[in-house]
């Protein structure tokens, strides 16, 4: 510091001497004097600049008032965390808007489906009314079941339990088949007639026929039944009633709701006497319970099938 002060005083003296008015000179030496004066001024200014701004002071040094590195790192992490949270918030906001738009579209679709369901319900009710009207008109023409048929149905119903649960409904037969020689007569008369004759005599062909059924051993008298052709009303059990115990058509249904309503069907004399070839080959019969051949196998037939497969 003492050296700096001394140099400063010296420099100030030089500056004072330089700034002082020079003595009057001759015109010849005035130019050389000015050059010398400028050189001295530059040298004194350089020494003054070096004394004030030393090279050591120009070297970079960390400021004394700067914050510690740990504090700077904490601030940076905090800012990065805030930026990350802002990005996550933007993503959640976009996802929320997408979900809201999807919900609105689903609500619109639900409303359209509800209106469509209402219109279909009205159309279904109209169709049910038409079906009831048509079935009521057709049922009014069909004759009531005779007394001897009722007696036969009561004999079948008495052999079963009075409670009609699901197991009992599933065990009921789909139809009551009566093998008779009259089946051949009916088919022969129907095939021999032409189309016009069949249209005129459709009532006589499709009407019922009385046949005698030979009872089991121990019963001497044969039972006279009134049988119907396959496909007529109440000749087959209602699938809906057999599954759930109820039918949406009620009394207007063309199928039987129980063994009491089931009408006997006249069949070929050899109906269900031979085994279905589809069952022998191990395939499923497409006709199901309507097949005219037997689907149940005896022990002897099972043994023969096992021998054939070997």
Swiss-Prot record:
Q: Which PROSITE patterns match?
A: ZF_C3H1 (PS50103)
Question: In the UniProt record, does the keyword Zinc occur?
Answer: yes
UniProt feature coiled coil, ranges: 84-129
Per the record, the domain of life is Eukaryota
Q: Which InterPro entries match?
A: ZFP36-like, Znf_CCCH, Znf_CCCH_sf
Where are the zinc-finger regions (C3H1-type) in this chain? 232-260, 270-298
Q: In which tissues is it expressed?
A: Highly expressed in secondary cell wall-forming tissues and the xylem cells of roots. Expressed predominantly in inflorescence stems, flowers and siliques. Highly expressed in the basal portion of stems, where cells are undergoing secondary cell wall thickening.
Claim: Membrane is one of the keywords in the record: no
> Residue ranges under compositional bias (Basic and acidic residues)?
155-167
State the Gene Ontology BP annotations. negative regulation of secondary cell wall biogenesis; negative regulation of unidimensional cell growth; positive regulation of DNA-templated transcription
Q: Listed GO molecular functions?
A: DNA binding; mRNA binding; zinc ion binding
Q: Where is this region: Disordered?
A: 56-75, 155-174
- Pfam families xrefs: zf-CCCH (PF00642)
The function of this protein is: Functions probably as a transcriptional factor that activates genes involved in secondary cell wall biosynthesis. May play a role in both transcriptional and post-transcriptional regulation. Binds to ssDNA, dsDNA, and ribohomopolymers in vitro. Maybe involved in post-transcriptional regulation of its target genes. Targets RNA of a polygalacturonase, a well-known cell wall modifying gene. Functions redudantly with C3H15 to regulate secondary cell wall formation. C3H14 and C3H15 have overlapping roles in the regulation of secondary cell wall formation and anther development.
Anything else known? Plants overexpressing C3H14 exhibit small and slightly curled leaves, and retarded stem elongations due to cell elongation defect and ectopic secondary cell wall formation. Plants overexpressing C3H14 are sterile due to stamen elongation defect, despite normal overall flower morphology. Overexpression of C3H14 results in secondary cell wall thickening in fibers and vessels.
- Spell out the protein name for this chain: Zinc finger CCCH domain-containing protein 14
Q: Which organism is it from?
A: Arabidopsis thaliana (Mouse-ear cress)
**Organism taxonomic ancestry:** Eukaryota, Viridiplantae, Streptophyta, Embryophyta, Tracheophyta
Which gene is this protein's source?
C3H14
């Amino acid at each position: 510091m003492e050296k700096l002060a001394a140099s400063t005083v010296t420099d100030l003296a030089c500056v004072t001497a330089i700034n002082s008015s020079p003595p009057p000179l001759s015109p010849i030496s005035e130019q050389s004097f000015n050059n010398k004066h400028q050189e001295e001024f530059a040298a004194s200014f350089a020494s003054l600049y070096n004394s004030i701004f030393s090279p050591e002071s120009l070297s970079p040094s960390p400021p004394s008032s700067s914050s510690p590195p740990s504090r700077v790192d904490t601030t940076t992490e905090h800012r990065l965390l805030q930026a990350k949270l802002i990005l996550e918030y933007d993503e959640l906001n976009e996802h929320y808007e997408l979900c809201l738009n999807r919900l609105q579209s689903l609500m619109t679709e639900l409303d359209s489906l509800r209106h469509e369901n209402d219109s279909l319900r009205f159309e279904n009710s109209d169709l049910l009314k038409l079906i009831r009207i048509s079935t009521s008109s057709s049922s009014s023409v069909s004759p009531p079941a005779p007394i001897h048929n009722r007696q036969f149905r009561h004999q079948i119903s008495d052999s079963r339990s009075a409670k009609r649960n699901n197991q009992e409904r599933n065990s009921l037969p789909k139809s009551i088949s009566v093998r008779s020689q009259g089946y051949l007569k009916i088919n022969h008369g129907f095939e021999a007639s032409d189309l016009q004759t069949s249209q005129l005599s459709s009532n006589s062909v499709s009407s019922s026929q009385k046949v005698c059924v030979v009872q089991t051993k121990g019963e001497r008298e044969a039972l006279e039944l009134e049988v119907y052709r396959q496909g007529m009303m109440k000749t087959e059990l209602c699938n809906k009633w057999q599954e759930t115990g109820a039918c949406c058509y009620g009394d207007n249904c063309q199928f039987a709701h129980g063994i009491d309503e089931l009408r006997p069907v006249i069949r070929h004399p050899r109906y269900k006497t031979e085994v279905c070839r589809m069952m022998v080959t191990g395939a499923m019969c497409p006709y199901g319970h309507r097949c005219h051949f037997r689907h149940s196998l005896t022990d002897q037939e099972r043994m023969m099938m096992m021998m054939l497969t070997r």
